[in-house]
Amino acid sequence: MVREEVAGSTQTLQWKCVESRVDSKRLYYGRFILSPLRKGQADTVGIALRRALLGEIEGTCITRAKFGSVPHEYSTIAGIEESVQEILLNLKEIVLRSNLYGVRDASICVKGPRYITAQDIILPPSVEIVDTAQPIANLTEPIDFCIDLQIKRDRGYQTELRKNYQDGSYPIDAVSMPVRNVNYSIFSCGNGNEKHEILFLEIWTNGSLTPKEALYEASRNLIDLFLPFLHAEEEGASFEENKNRFTPPLFTFQKRLTNLKKNKKGIPLNCIFIDQLELTSRTYNCLKRANIHTLLDLLSKTEEDLLRIDSFRMEDRKHIWDTLEKHLPIDLLKNKLSF
């Protein structure tokens, strides 16, 4: 982080992209500006965005590779220049672009002699290779070479215990981080008591998404994180009503639904978030992956819609129904969900 003094003027808060370039297929760069900010706000925004960009953006990676009869990852395969470990490292570097959730299968099946590149990977329709020229292996002899792959969308750095698999399957330590680096600098402007700050944000990505897309997703994640605090007034928890209480009332799912059934001021269904339903972490994650964030989103889905969600099971369906049945009018449930 860099802080400098520059001349500037006071305007309505706004942001824009001041520089954008593509250095290579796997290196995009963007520079953004946000101004004017009061003293201290630039640091607050810069720190939050940097952490969200580096840790909260999801990416798609190859997470597992299955060879034929290979005793361990340091083995060599006749007719292939690289060892199994080198092939795994090359697969780890492949950059993919997709919006898929859950695990997907892919494969490579070629005949040598020839170079194998990312272009030779047979992918599901929802996945795209960013740089098809990325190397994987070099077949030096006329042999048939096949690899079964698993692809997964996740965030952060995923590691698995190293061990030999009898079926020739090996995990790959996936780096699901589309944003390669983030830097921000702060510039002070104005004179006397009219000083303001300008935030410059630099973003480098691996090509699976643009810096602008990454900034949008990080901002969306931060907004979602703070959304529950924006509905405090809807709970009727005003300061005057609670100033003598030691602990403020919790914004629980049960209380929201009680207000809903009393049909008083009516809490909108889109203001009740699924993280307040006290669901299991498994059921909650399934719904989030399907972009179901509120009770309105959930009640808009049919049973068939839910069962089409990746990894969603009948047990999850029953768990959701049991939770809603205890709190919502049965007529509403019958109209919305055909469980």
Curated annotation (Swiss-Prot):
This protein's GO CC annotations: chloroplast; DNA-directed RNA polymerase complex; mitochondrion
Keywords, ordered alphabetically: Chloroplast, DNA-directed RNA polymerase, Nucleotidyltransferase, Plastid, Transcription, Transferase
Regions annotated as coiled coil: none
One Pfam family it belongs to: RNA_pol_L
Subcellular localization(s) per the UniProt record: Plastid, Chloroplast
Catalytic activity entry: RNA(n) + a ribonucleoside 5'-triphosphate = RNA(n+1) + diphosphate
InterPro entries attached to this UniProt entry: DNA-dir_RNA_pol_insert, DNA-dir_RNA_pol_RpoA/D/Rpb3, DNA-dir_RpoA, RBP11-like, RNAP_asu_C, RNApol_insert_sf
Region annotation Alpha C-terminal domain (alpha-CTD): where it falls in the sequence: 264-339
Source organism superkingdom: Eukaryota
Enzyme kind, highest EC tier: transferase
GO molecular function, one term: DNA binding
EC number: 2.7.7.6
Biological processes, Gene Ontology terms: DNA-templated transcription
Region (Alpha N-terminal domain (alpha-NTD)): 10-233
Main location as per UniProt: plastid
NCBIfam families: rpoA (TIGR02027)
Domain notes per entry: The N-terminal domain is essential for RNAP assembly and basal transcription, whereas the C-terminal domain is involved in interaction with transcriptional regulators and with upstream promoter elements.
Family affiliation: Belongs to the RNA polymerase alpha chain family.
Subunit description: In plastids the minimal PEP RNA polymerase catalytic core is composed of four subunits: alpha, beta, beta', and beta''. When a (nuclear-encoded) sigma factor is associated with the core the holoenzyme is formed, which can initiate transcription.
Function description: DNA-dependent RNA polymerase catalyzes the transcription of DNA into RNA using the four ribonucleoside triphosphates as substrates.
Name of the protein in its database record: DNA-directed RNA polymerase subunit alpha
Species of provenance: Triticum aestivum (Wheat)
Native organism taxonomy: Eukaryota, Viridiplantae, Streptophyta, Embryophyta, Tracheophyta
Gene that encodes it: rpoA
